[in-house]
């Protein structure tokens, strides 16, 4: 049985994929019973780093709705993923010492749970600068998937296969001689416009005894 580990899974903030397009149904259950919680008006994208001081920062409507059917709290508008997480996205895991410690501890726990063998496949979806995969030895087959890899390539260990794109199973099929023993999605699952489709595609490339580890923020604790 495939083991899917969720940390603070569905009660999260969802940011999605079409610039400033208002949704009319829940991203999780497709219910139309959406109740507006608050509206903060038009806001700039906080993860967008400027190339020059006169560059325009993309913005969009920041309002939240609550699904009365499945209880998912989510953004009312969708945003273009290529703009939010393209070449102007500025976050790097390696700049934060506490994050590196967290990722290292996570890798140790996953190794223990998964009982990894040589050449087992590990896929990190949203791999950023490769920090998490760097805690796995070269004896494993490692794949990082992230739309910012092009500009962060120099931070990746040479043995890590890099896919400079958003996750779709067809993008990684050519690298698969077998399915993955571990797939991780760290602080990116809430960015999905279609989380159920994403989950199915992860399932399709996961071994029957594999582990999918998802980590997200938990809204009640954030408040």
Which residue stretches match the model-derived regions?
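Conserved SAM-binding strand-loop segment of SAM-dependent methyltransferases
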Residues: 158-170
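A conserved beta-strand element that flanks and buttresses the S-adenosyl-L-methionine
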Residues: 184
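N-terminal juxtadomain amphipathic helix
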Residues: 21-97
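Conserved SAM-binding loop of SAM-dependent methyltransferases across substrates and taxa
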Residues: 129-139
